[in-house]
């Protein structure tokens, strides 16, 4: 923010009755993050020195959910309008700082639009964010005289002539703290709703001869609020469309932009291809020439250059080096690490496990608390038995090891370089280099065996 605009107020006390939810309205998520968190993050991006969060309904849950956020919690015990909400925060305003007012249920407002608003605010006056709508129904109208803003009239209080005005108030404004405190003290509730409107300060400022300058958002969606789940879903689609368009323009190939969800941050290289119905959560990095198959979910992971993730794979808190292949239907859980050219096939699950250079776990395998060296083959049905019901134990497999199908490795256990484990083995002791270990039951042949025959009832 500019040197004079140091604090932000976020109004977030509403119950959200039309959401039909026990969750406070502003905690409902858009793109995997609560609406109010979007606004808090925008305030941070402006460099706000202090953020005042006005809360009411569901206060304990609000604090539990957002407790780690560096905000000043301001209680609005009764919801008596936006002006009343600002009155609760006013004691925290410094006279010589500018105050930017935002809303916890208007999540798509951008840093760029707010910087424009702050820039137009005149000394001693108000910067007001407005927008022109073909259908302004339901919004407060901007009243001008000779081009100057002189007031705002709410829909329910507007005259027939005022209802024809298409310039509407978004509710977002910036003003000096000392001026705000003076104007807020003069508000009354002499209106149809019997509420204290923050918009009434516009007329008060005009009466003092103060200038009100306006700015407009880059996109209309920036000023759209949420009162019900239908509106939230609509904003979700708008947000996802904007993210998809941005990624396409940056060179990411989304095979169907309408079927892609970004619920975090995606950092990408060149020639990345993402198929349909992929969900990105948290912080995800995709290297050059990465391919992501349909239906994959990627969360807080790094995928190296040239790696291919086949359909319906879930990767969370994992790191993949270059030219890895994973899936389809694989699951890499937190702590999974794949070295260059490692392969994880269908129905393989890894947790706190690493796979060395060129190693393969092709199918139907669980690797937990396991270190696997280079050029290892893990046969189908291999299980590392890492949990005894109380504690976890580690399995270590060296380089150039062959693990036969249907092997159970009962941790803690180590398999040294070059060892071979025969199919069907239950391994309970360490294996030396280049040893062959087989523990299956001796095969028995019985000639002329006759199967039992069911008795007829």
Curated annotation (Swiss-Prot):
Region of interest: Pyrophosphorylase: 1-229
Binding site for UDP-N-acetyl-alpha-D-glucosamine: 11-14, 25, 76, 81-82, 103-105, 140, 154, 169, 227, 333, 351, 366, 377
Active site: 363
Domain of life: Bacteria
Catalyzed reactions per annotation: alpha-D-glucosamine 1-phosphate + acetyl-CoA = N-acetyl-alpha-D-glucosamine 1-phosphate + CoA + H(+); N-acetyl-alpha-D-glucosamine 1-phosphate + UTP + H(+) = UDP-N-acetyl-alpha-D-glucosamine + diphosphate
Main location: cytoplasm
One of the protein's GO biological processes: UDP-N-acetylglucosamine biosynthetic process
Pfam families according to UniProt: Hexapep, NTP_transf_3
Keywords (A to Z) from UniProt: Acyltransferase, Cell shape, Cell wall biogenesis/degradation, Cytoplasm, Magnesium, Metal-binding, Multifunctional enzyme, Nucleotidyltransferase, Peptidoglycan synthesis, Repeat, Transferase
Residues engaged in binding acetyl-CoA: 380, 386-387, 405, 423, 440
Details of cofactor binding: Binds 1 Mg(2+) ion per subunit.
MF terms (GO), sorted A to Z: glucosamine-1-phosphate N-acetyltransferase activity; magnesium ion binding; UDP-N-acetylglucosamine diphosphorylase activity
Region (N-acetyltransferase): 251-457
UniProt subcellular location: Cytoplasm
Pathway noted in the entry: Nucleotide-sugar biosynthesis; UDP-N-acetyl-alpha-D-glucosamine biosynthesis; N-acetyl-alpha-D-glucosamine 1-phosphate from alpha-D-glucosamine 6-phosphate (route II): step 2/2; Nucleotide-sugar biosynthesis; UDP-N-acetyl-alpha-D-glucosamine biosynthesis; UDP-N-acetyl-alpha-D-glucosamine from N-acetyl-alpha-D-glucosamine 1-phosphate: step 1/1; Bacterial outer membrane biogenesis; LPS lipid A biosynthesis
Keyword Cytoplasm among UniProt keywords: yes
Annotated stretches, region: Linker: 230-250
Record note on quaternary structure: Homotrimer.
Protein family membership: In the N-terminal section; belongs to the N-acetylglucosamine-1-phosphate uridyltransferase family. In the C-terminal section; belongs to the transferase hexapeptide repeat family.
PANTHER family tied to this protein: BIFUNCTIONAL PROTEIN GLMU, NUCLEOTIDYL TRANSFERASE
Function summary: Catalyzes the last two sequential reactions in the de novo biosynthetic pathway for UDP-N-acetylglucosamine (UDP-GlcNAc). The C-terminal domain catalyzes the transfer of acetyl group from acetyl coenzyme A to glucosamine-1-phosphate (GlcN-1-P) to produce N-acetylglucosamine-1-phosphate (GlcNAc-1-P), which is converted into UDP-GlcNAc by the transfer of uridine 5-monophosphate (from uridine 5-triphosphate), a reaction catalyzed by the N-terminal domain.
Protein name: Bifunctional protein GlmU
Origin species: Proteus mirabilis (strain HI4320)
Gene: glmU
């Amino acid at each position: 923010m500019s040197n004079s605009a140091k604090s932000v107020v976020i109004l977030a006390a509403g119950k959200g009755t039309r959401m039909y939810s026990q969750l406070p309205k502003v905690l409902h998520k858009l793109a995997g993050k609560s609406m109010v968190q979007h606004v808090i993050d925008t305030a941070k991006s402006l460099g706000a020195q202090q953020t005042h969060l006005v809360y009411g309904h569901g206060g304990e849950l609000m604090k539990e959910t957002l407790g780690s956020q560096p905000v000043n919690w301001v209680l609005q015990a009764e919801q008596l309008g936006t002006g009343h909400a600002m009155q609760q925060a006013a004691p925290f305003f410094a006279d010589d700082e500018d105050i930017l007012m935002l809303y916890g249920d208007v999540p798509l407002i951008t840093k760029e639009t707010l910087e424009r608003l702050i820039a137009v605010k005149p000394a001693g006056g108000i910067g007001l964010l407005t927008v022109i709508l073909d259908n302004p129904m339901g919004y407060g109208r901007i009243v001008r005289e000779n081009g100057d803003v002189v007031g705002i009239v709410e829909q329910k209080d507007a005259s027939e002539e005022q209802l024809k005005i298409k310039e509407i108030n978004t509710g977002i404004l910036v003003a000096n703290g000392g001026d705000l405190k003076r104007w807020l003290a003069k508000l009354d509730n002499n209106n149809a709703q019997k509420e204290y409107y923050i918009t009434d300060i516009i007329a008060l400022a005009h009466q003092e001869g103060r200038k009100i300058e306006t700015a407009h958002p880059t996109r209309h969606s920036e000023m759209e609020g949420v009162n019900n789940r239908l509106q939230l879903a609509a904003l979700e689609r708008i947000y996802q469309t904007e993210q998809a368009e941005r990624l396409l323009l940056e060179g990411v190939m989304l095979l169907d932009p309408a079927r892609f969800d970004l619920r975090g941050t995606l950092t990408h290289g060149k020639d990345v291809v993402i198929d349909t119905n992929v969900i990105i959560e948290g912080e995800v990095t995709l290297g050059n020439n990465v391919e992501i198959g349909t239906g994959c979910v990627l969360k807080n992971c790094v995928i190296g250059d040239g790696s291919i993730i086949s359909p319906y794979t879930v990767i969370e808190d994992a790191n993949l080096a270059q030219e890895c292949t994973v899936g389809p239907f694989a699951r890499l859980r937190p702590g999974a690490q794949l070295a260059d050219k490692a392969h994880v096939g269908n129905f393989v699950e890894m947790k706190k496990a690493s796979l060395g250079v060129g190693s393969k776990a092709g199918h139907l395998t669980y690797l937990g608390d396991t270190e696997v060296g280079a050029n290892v083959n893990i046969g189908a049905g291999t299980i590392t038995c890492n949990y005894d019901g109380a504690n976890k134990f580690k399995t270590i497999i060296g380089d150039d090891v062959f693990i036969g199908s249907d092997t159970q490795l009962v941790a803690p256990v180590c398999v040294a370089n070059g060892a071979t484990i025969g199919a069907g083995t239950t391994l309970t002791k360490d294996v030396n280099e280049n040893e062959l270990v087989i523990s299956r039951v001796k095969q028995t042949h019985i000639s002329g065996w006759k199967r039992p025959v069911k008795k007829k009832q």
